[in-house]
């Protein structure tokens, strides 16, 4: 998708792992597979939409019991923290830390500053994709995609993929392009 290689393996609808160019060791316990740029179809390319209208990955959501610990682990792996915020937009107070991995954003979420931290293992919590035309993608996917609504990012819209109907356990959202 765009400049990001997506290789599906295994069965059972579980998200089993990821690879980041230049990273070979686990990040705060989060397994990382070796990035294989010799695999057919791994040459970066322009945003060519799939027939469902998806053109690239927008961001990967990583959940941690301790944002400071996990952000430091990402920094040690060579990824730069590019911003962050505290929010209650999703209910309980939480912290979001944003990092870039190539052209994909990593959104690290966990307890807000001053909230108790935990030893909860770091995990992939969600995936957000970009559709060239969100309404067309929603039409193509029919009842498999929720109704598009305003996203947190100004000028963008978002809709959730109905994972149970699709057969996946990882929360997936589809977003309109950046404006």
Predicted regions and their residues:
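Glyoxalase I/VOC metalloenzyme domain signal
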Residues: 1-82, 93, 100-179
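Short helix-loop boundary/capping segments
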Residues: 85-87
């Amino acid at each position: 998708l765009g400049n990001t290689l997506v290789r599906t393996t295994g069965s059972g609808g579980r998200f089993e792992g990821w690879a980041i160019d230049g990273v070979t060791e686990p990040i705060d316990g989060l397994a990382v597979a070796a990035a294989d740029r010799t695999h057919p179809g791994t040459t970066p390319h322009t945003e060519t939409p799939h027939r469902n209208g998806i053109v690239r990955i927008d961001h990967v959501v990583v959940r941690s019991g301790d944002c400071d610990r996990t952000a430091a682990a990402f920094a040690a792996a060579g990824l730069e923290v590019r911003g962050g915020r505290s929010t209650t937009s999703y209910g309980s107070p939480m912290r979001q830390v944003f990092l870039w991995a190539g052209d994909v954003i990593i959104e690290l979420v966990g307890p807000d500053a001053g909230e108790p931290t935990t030893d909860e293992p770091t995990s992939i919590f969600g995936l957000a994709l970009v559709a060239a035309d969100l309404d067309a993608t929603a039409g193509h996917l029919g009842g498999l995609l929720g109704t598009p609504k305003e996203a947190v990012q100004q000028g963008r819209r978002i809709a959730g993929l109905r994972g149970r109907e699709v057969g996946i356990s990882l929360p997936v959202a589809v977003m309109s392009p950046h404006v």
